[in-house]
């Protein structure tokens, strides 16, 4: 009788350990790799398009584990100083949307090159991952936007 009890105890310990390991595995956080994005900034991408000769680019990386978007970029040839810069969304190419995240600091001078970071909400992250964000640089001559580029996964 004592041997049967020992076998059942051992079997119970094994089953319990396996169930516990499965539970730990299923609840452990999943850390996805950062996702890279890029955007080519040009006046022809604005809505409506403009005839600026300015150009620029933005590269960005979104880290799902921290919900942090980090970016850097450059621009040149704008009609004047950039008065504000933002990420807008959600919007597909050819559509406009409101400001999602400021690239520049409101009320501060903005120049090239630039960089920054922000923590996104779940909704913002979903829109970014779905290709629904664009970068937009504004000037006095083009207050609605002089240079625009849709963020695409790179």
Question: Model-predicted segments: where are they?
Answer:
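Metal-centered catalytic cores of metalloenzymes
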Residues: 2-85, 89-154
């Amino acid at each position: 009788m004592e041997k049967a009890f020992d076998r059942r105890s051992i079997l119970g310990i094994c089953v319990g350990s396996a169930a516990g390991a499965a539970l730990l595995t299923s609840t452990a956080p999943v850390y996805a790799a950062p996702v890279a994005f890029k955007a080519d900034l040009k006046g022809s991408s604005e809505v409506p398009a403009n005839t600026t000769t300015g150009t620029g680019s933005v590269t960005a990386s979104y880290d799902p584990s921290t919900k942090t978007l980090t970016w850097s970029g450059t621009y040149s040839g704008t009609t004047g100083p950039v008065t504000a810069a933002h990420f807008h969304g959600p919007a597909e190419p050819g559509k406009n949307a409101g400001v999602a995240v400021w690239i520049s600091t409101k009320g501060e001078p903005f120049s090239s090159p630039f960089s920054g970071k922000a923590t996104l909400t779940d909704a913002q992250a979903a829109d970014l991952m779905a290709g629904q964000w664009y970068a937009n640089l504004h000037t006095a001559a083009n207050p609605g936007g002089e240079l625009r580029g849709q963020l695409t996964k790179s």
